[in-house]
Amino acid sequence: MKKDFITKQEQRQPLRQLYMWLKSLQSTLVFMQTGAHPDDETSRMLARLSLGDGMHVVYVNAVRGQGGQNALGPERGDALGYLRTEELFEAMRVIRADIAWLAESSDDPISDFGFSKSGEQTFEHWGREHSLRQMVKMVRLFKPDILIPTFLDVPGQHGHHRAVTQTTIAAFDEAADAKKFDDLELAAWQVNTLYLPAWGGGGGSYDDEVPPPDATHEIRTGAYDAVLGGTYAQIGEWSRACHATQGMGRQVDEEERPVPLHQLRTASGKAVPTGLTQDVPERLAALAAHCRDEKGREAAILAQKAADDALTAFPNGEAVLSALCHLQTALLALEKSVSPRHVHRVHLKMRQAGMAACEAAALQFHFEVSPAVPVVGQPAEASLSWHVADPANAPVISATMKGPEQITCGPFAGSGRGKRRQSMTASLDIAGPPIDAMTGWHGVMVSPTSLHAEVSVKIAKTEFVVPLCPDTVFSTMPVHTGQITPNRTLLRHGQDSDIDMQLQLEATLKPDEHAHLTLPKGWTFDLVAGDSDTKLQGRVTVPSSARQGHYRIGAKVIEQEVFSTQRLAYPHIRPQTRFAMASANIALVDTAGLNGVRIGWIDGGVDEAHHWADQLGAHIIQLDNNRLISGDFEGIDVIVAGVFAGGTRPLNRSMRHIRSWIESGGHFVSQYHRPIDNWDKTQSAPLRLQPGSPSIRWRVTDAVAPVRMLQPDHPLLNSPNRITNEDFDGWVKERGLYFASEWDPAYVPLLAMSDTDEAPLEGSLLAARIGAGSHVHCALNLFYQMDHMVVGAFRLFANLMTPSGRT
């Protein structure tokens, strides 16, 4: 496999990048779309507006995507949120768009807490006022002329989507009211036009109950751009493919795929029948009407001519640079004369002209920090380097660094003058608290809040200033880092009392420092071995008086928390490091074990429930495709089909063998599946069974929704553990999803539950007797509950995994 840096260097496309920046000089409009999750954006529309029309596109996203699935690897929760943050960064880079986040940091209440069915349910987590404040902030920062949410606020749509649409519509007025959220210290901004999508949000997941509004406008995406090598719809899919953890991106042909819009509101109160805006300067020349003197009006006309000349000169770099220098000169004159309401348009064009000039001059900037993730309190260095095509006529480069208040940036000192690759370095003093990789926005219109360099590039006596961020995601490391192992442990109450545990620190402690574990009350730690400067190794003893529950063990050096680190790296995104307080989580559960049970696992790569079966004492046998297709189940007591396993494993081909094995006395457990996971209601289960669609109608999103036992005396709810309503206490995120919507009469529904004001669903847990054996289909989100140490989930899981012919 090629090394990442070689691949990136090989795939550089400076001419394409130059072309994209030159296109951005053709419009002075700002277009903002809002969405809830990374991958909600209407990519082909944004590609057309940005790369076709030259509008400055800003996509405002609410959450980081912590609640999604991961098609690439094991990362879930917060780790997945970091991956999806980077995926959206890459997706927007493809279509040359800025990104802003309502959740500006990893601890923001606007989080991907799980599925919801209404805006009200969503705001219970996010906070309605906080959400609106954040949306108003982004509107005032980026000053869009056109604003549109991604989805409609209608029943049957995801509650996160509905909440974002509500705040987007409200922000149209609120952002223009200087008295609202004046603590932001941002000038009020009136959006010119507000649109809604004129398309429905139905499909396999959602079920809009109200049809979309009539289309008043249309964005056509079928035009082919010979330089970029695709239509805007195709480029949109290149962007969507960056959301690889969500399996996004599909092949589309060169055909027209229009995007219909519905004009909802305008600043004037009058409909705008043609064009997307009214009385807004759409090009540099149009700014002439907003200048206070003739010199400014002439500058606007000259700026427009220079922007046009630069695009016409492409790909002649020398001619492009000449035109860009004329453009920058005109923009400086225009800046002094244009109305304050429109000066941001001039500033944006200056930055975009600077980015274009850097590409035309083939500077190929690199901005690196060493070490890549500096430790708080330890020295670090920043290095800025660039390529010089002609050392005898090299641009004059200078730079200043800016960043959060925790960072003190030294001045840059240059080296390598006269060489093809020149550079400058500067010192960084890093204070606490640690800086997280998640930042509030990325792009060229608004200066980053994270570490960045403001780089001055002088070409032929014309100065351009561009913002540059480090090549890799910038964050800083806490002082003390390490790992506690094992980090997740299941103990059976009354059976297990000791845990062998180790704290491994990543750096040697100072002579006056010492590390210790922080234990629940009454728990003890006996040191067995280890160098106290780097490692503690010993045995944790749980007192007999400890009650069933979830317990946490942490670590400190003196009184400073120890943090664990996780490196996140995939080829399609920039690597990054996240950190969280080091911890070991223990579930102390009053449950029977699975000692001696041989479980054949059909792993779908989504859940790790087999880990918990192993901790309960079962012997796990991972069934490969050959064993499935041949029906080689000799010596296996239970077969489990993991979450979504049918999407990647030959479940349908092997079902006749599984059915025969069940009839001979085997116990089969299937976890929840989507209809898209190659599900066939007559072939994917031993008897007819169908997961419901659209999924919003067949899930219970309220994690504390009441659960009614339809068959309280059924063996599955009584052996080996007696399941009660207490076992459904403390659940997180949701009860379950993709509940069965229809099933063979042989199946017995065991539970009923629903979200508020909805009819009870009975397809969450089904059991059937088939010959001498049995099948249980479980659409409860058990694996997620166990991963979050919910004790009742372990008790029910043990019952599901026990082969006793109880159904």
Protein language model annotation of sequence segments:
Residues 647-727:
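A glycine-rich, often tryptophan-bearing local segment used as a flexible ligand/cofactor-contacting loop or short
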Residues 54-55, 189-192, 664-667, 773:
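A short helix->loop->beta-strand "cap" motif at the edges of active sites that frequently abuts
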Residues 562-641, 784, 802-805:
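Aromatic-Pro/Gly-enriched surface loop or interdomain linker
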Residues 369-588, 593-595:
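Long beta-sheet-rich domains in secretory-pathway and surface-associated proteins
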Residues 2-181, 195, 200-201:
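Active-site beta-strand->loop->alpha-helix modules in alpha/beta enzyme cores, enriched
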Residues 696-789:
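Catalytic beta-strand/loop cores that center a nucleophilic Ser/Cys/Thr
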Residues 2-10, 17, 174-364:
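The feature marks non-catalytic terminal segments
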Residues 346-347, 478-499, 506-509, 573-592, ...:
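Extracellular ligand-binding/catalytic regions of CAZymes and related secreted enzymes
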